[in-house]
Structures are given as C-alpha cells and as structure tokens.
A protein has these predicted regions:
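Mature, Sec-exported extracytoplasmic domains of Gram-positive
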Residues: 26-181
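Repetitive helical segments and hydrophobic/amphipathic motifs
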Residues: 12-14
C-alpha cells in the first residue's frame, strides 16, 4: 500500500510538471545580474580567491554523511542516497544519486556564496538566506522543478527523505543541517 505522504508528493510533483509545461519558455534575462544567474557564472567577484569547496571532504556513509569544507559543514542522514559536486568556486550542489543516474537531475540544494552587496540571488526562483560569515553571504538554492522520476515510488521516497532534511535550511530550524565556519 502506498504511503499518503508519497502519494501527495507524487501528485504535487505532477502538478508542478504540468504547471512548468504550461508556463512555456522562460523570458530572456534583462539585467547583468539575471544573465549571471542564468549562465551559472561565479557569484563572488572574480578578483576574490574565495573557493567554497576549499578542502572539501566527504565522510561517513550509510545512515549519515558529512560534507566539510573550510567554509561550512553539512550533515545529512540517508548518506548512501546522496552525493555532492563542486560546480564552481562559489557553488556546491548536493544531489540524489539515484535520480541523477536516471537523468532526472536529482538536485536537492545548491549552496552558493555571494558578496553581501550582490543581491542577484533575489532573482533565483527558490532560495533561502543561510547567513553571512567572513564577509560572504551564503544562499541555499532549491530546485524549481521535479528532480526525480515521479513514476518510481522508491526513488521518490529516497529523494523526499533527504529533501525534508535540506528543507530545514529554508526554515532556519534550530536543527538545520548546515553550520557556517
């Protein structure tokens, strides 16, 4: 028997897919900040030698896995179901392994860094401010489309289990899985 949460998650995913399809093509970015966000270019100033993935280490597995860098630590359970990649000097993405392997993206969250004066992150479709530390603004960017195969119940459950933890970043919960250094 299918769990009610799974059914609701799959229905919401389908609604999101239909809504995204109905919206059509995204408008061309108008400002330089929008273009920068669209192209995925580094968000910190290029003269800065900041590297969000500096000394990135992955530890653990099984029930818990930890991403540790010089700038933040993130601890999530369901360690065997997710992994991370350094996208650029200013972005690290955490993704669901199964969904990514099935070509559904699998992105759970991207941790991005901005200079405090750069507010271009406000144009991201879904984000939350993690905080400011050492002269940098840390942003969590969440996917705005379905990142797993909605017809695969197990894949949906695996994705949702870790996404619930990642969502604590958005909520600013006391038990948020991320700590800025």
């Amino acid at each position: 028997m299918t769990k009610p949460k799974t059914v609701i998650a799959m229905l919401l995913s389908l609604v999101l897919v239909f809504a995204m399809t109905a919206c059509g093509q995204k408008a061309e970015p108008e400002s330089e900040a929008e273009q920068q966000t669209e192209t995925g270019q580094d968000t910190a100033e290029s003269s800065d030698d900041y590297d969000i993935g500096s000394n990135l280490q992955l530890a653990g597995g099984g029930d818990e896995k930890v991403i540790d860098t010089d700038h933040f630590t993130i601890t999530l359970t369901h360690g065997s179901s997710w992994d991370c990649t350094v996208d650029s000097k200013t972005s690290v993405t955490i993704y669901n392994v199964t969904a990514k392997a099935a070509n559904y993206g699998g992105r759970l969250v991207s941790i991005k860094v901005y200079n405090p004066a750069d507010k271009s992150y406000e144009m991201l479709p879904s984000y939350s401010v993690i905080g400011e530390k050492n002269g940098k603004m840390y942003i969590a960017e969440y996917p705005s489309d379905v990142q797993f195969d909605p017809s695969d119940e197990q894949a949906a459950e695996d994705y949702q289990a870790v996404y619930e933890e990642v969502s604590k970043i958005r909520e600013g919960a006391a038990d948020s899985p991320i700590i800025l250094k």
